[in-house]
Curated annotation (Swiss-Prot):
This is Alpha-galactosidase. Substrate binds at D72, D73, K147, R205, Q251. It catalyses: Hydrolysis of terminal, non-reducing alpha-D-galactose residues in alpha-D-galactosides, including galactose oligosaccharides, galactomannans and galactolipids. The keyword Cytoplasm does not apply. Its EC number is 3.2.1.22. GO terms for molecular function: alpha-galactosidase activity. Transmembrane segments: none annotated. One of its GO terms (cellular component) is extracellular region. It is an enzyme of class 3 (hydrolase). It comes from Saccharomyces pastorianus (strain ATCC 76529 / Carlsberg bottom yeast no.1 / CBS 1513 / CLIB 176 / NBRC 1167 / NCYC 396 / NRRL Y-12693) (Saaz-type lager yeast). Belongs to the glycosyl hydrolase 27 family. Keywords: Disulfide bond, Glycoprotein, Glycosidase, Hydrolase, Secreted, Signal. Glycans are attached at N82, N175, N270, N403, N412, N417, N422, N435, N454. The active site is at D149 (nucleophile), D209 (proton donor). The gene is MEL.
Length: 471
């Protein structure tokens, strides 16, 4: 009954708002930015945030769209006698307003963190029961984004309505401040968040915490396969584990409210280049937030060239806002040392009539893979124009910035003469309308109504294409 109420109320609200499906007008495309947790955890400071922001700007990532700088847990030293949150003066000697001002003056947006519990996950003061005063603290300090966790929640979970009410309290408090604040739930998908998240928030985590492994199982992430409704979400979840859990959820996300598959592990740990490309591509394709988890001051050239791949980012920022669908998934006999091995095909519509597709190889050996128009346009039927048209195939990674150019940018702390896309000067939407070639990849062939798209996909890798109707 609660879920039926949510669907009914959302439909009514949508009818009133009309022009925007977002509950607060934010999140019309998935958020992009940087969060300190994956690399630095509690080792946070004013200097870290400001130096990171400067670096993101200097190497062109801000102009690619990575505009949120998000301070995660461990920033507080407690509360005053009247209950107001206090920033740790050793870590943040000039206070949070100073951080916000510096970021805003450099065209960034400032994110902070709390938990819908008595404490945060690291044991600092949480916001459960303090929603209004904490929302006012965030607003008065110029915060533009709140990541809201799920630790120490005093048992207030176990049914969708219970979790919904706990998270709605902060949603209402943020809205009451009058400041536009992007609201990012981090409740690990507990209590079917994908059903009710968009009613009160702009994004919601849908699994346990990620770690930089492509397929490796971990007992601390107990649910596997397509088990998206986990009683215990855990942490140390691999990239493929999270992706498989997300597969059925795309139908519940869209403009204003996004499934969050967790921060990006590109440049974190020891993922291969093919694994990092597949990870970034799939997060982009399912319209997950693109939040950098790496130390951008010590980024490999190859990882930088992934984060700066505008043709892939354009898939994520496509104004149609429709997450791709997994069309098929098959196990393969060539498994890795963890017993993991599978192949998948994903497809999704784009704003201008294009289609994005991915052939994903989770096996340990390079593999010939193919697809056809019936699979690509899986919801079409005989007689549909999509199935009777010829389509040009564009490789979304073929125009990737080479490692030498990337290294030069990183070493010189400047984009210089490199042709890195600038979404500040020309948005992805406008760039696509103007047919900016950097957003479409490189044409490699075409497919006819009765043809096959054939390719060889590397181990733990991806073939990632945009299809455009032939003219």
């Amino acid at each position: 009954m609660f879920l039926l109420y949510l669907f009914t109320s959302f439909a009514a609200v949508s009818g009133v708002l009309g022009s925007s499906p977002s509950y607060n007008g934010l999140g019309l495309t998935p958020q992009m930015g940087w969060d300190n947790w994956n690399t630095f955890a509690c080792d946070v400071s004013e200097q870290l945030l400001l130096d990171t922001a400067d670096r993101i700007s200097e190497i062109g990532l801000k102009d690619l769209g990575y505009t949120y700088v998000i301070l995660d847990d461990c920033w507080s030293s407690g509360r005053t006698a009247n209950g107001t949150l206090v920033a740790d003066k050793e870590k943040f000697p000039n206070g949070m307003s100073h951080v916000a001002d510096h970021l805003h003056n450099n065209n960034f947006l400032f994110g902070m963190y709390s938990s819908a519990g008595e404490y945060t996950c690291a044991g600092y003061p949480g916001s459960l029961g303090h929603e209004e005063e904490d929302a006012e603290f965030f607003a008065s300090n110029g915060v533009d984004y709140l990541k809201y966790d799920n630790c120490y929640n005093k048992g207030q979970f176990g049914a969708p309505e219970t979790s919904y009410k706990r998270y709605k309290a902060m949603s209402d408090a943020l809205n009451k401040t009058g400041r536009p604040i992007f609201y990012s739930l981090c409740n690990w998908g507990q209590d079917l968040t994908h059903y009710w998240g968009s009613d009160i928030a702009n994004s919601w985590r849908m699994s346990g915490d990620i770690y930089p492994q492509f397929t490796r199982p971990d007992s601390r992430c107990p649910c596997d396969g397509d088990q998206f409704d986990c009683a215990y979400a855990g942490f140390h979840c691999s990239i493929m584990n999270i992706l498989n859990k997300a597969a059925p959820m795309g139908q519940n996300a869209g403009i204003g409210g996004w499934n969050d598959l967790d921060n990006l592990e590109v440049g974190v740990g020891n993922l291969t280049d093919d694994e990092e490309k597949a990870h970034f591509s799939m997060w982009a394709m399912v319209k997950s937030p693109l939040v950098i988890g790496a130390d951008v001051n010590h980024l490999k050239a190859s990882s930088y060239s992934i984060y700066s791949q505008a043709s892939v980012i354009a898939i994520n920022q496509d104004p149609k806002g429709v997450p791709a669908t997994r069309v098929w998934r098959h196990q393969v006999p060539q498994t890795d040392k963890y017993g993991q091995g599978e192949i998948q095909f994903w497809s999704g519509p784009l704003d201008n009539g294009d289609q994005v597709i991915a052939l994903l190889n989770g096996g340990i050996k390079p593999r010939p893979m193919n697809t056809n128009l019936e699979e690509i346009f899986f919801d079409s039927y005989l007689g549909f124009e999509q199935l009777s048209s010829n389509w040009d195939i564009y490789d979304l990674w073929a125009n990737r910035v080479d490692n030498a150019t990337s290294a030069n940018i990183l070493n010189n702390n400047s984009v210089g003469n490199a042709t890195i896309y600038n979404a500040t000067a020309l948005s992805y939407k406008d760039g696509m309308a103007k047919n900016d070639t950097r957003l479409f990849g490189t044409k490699i062939g075409s497919i006819s109504p009765d043809g096959l798209l054939n390719t060889t996909v590397p181990a733990h890798g991806i073939a990632f294409y945009r299809l455009r109707r032939s003219t």
